[in-house]
């Protein structure tokens, strides 16, 4: 999933440099959503490990 975040960030950067602002915005929105999902899963994993210990 981290690979997809990096790909979307690169697409957003390139699209922004080329003047395709709507594509850049869409790619950034996708990256933000994936970052939120990764953070939630990370917190759930950490809390699960703490609860087991």
Curated annotation (Swiss-Prot):
Protein name (database record): UPF0391 membrane protein Meso_3392
Membrane topology designation: Multi-pass membrane protein
Residues spanning the membrane: 4-24, 33-53
InterPro entries listed in its UniProt record: DUF1328
Annotated localization: Cell membrane
Assigned keywords, A-Z: Cell membrane, Membrane, Transmembrane, Transmembrane helix
Coiled-coil ranges per UniProt: none
GO terms under cellular component: plasma membrane
Main subcellular localisation: membrane
Family listed: Belongs to the UPF0391 family.
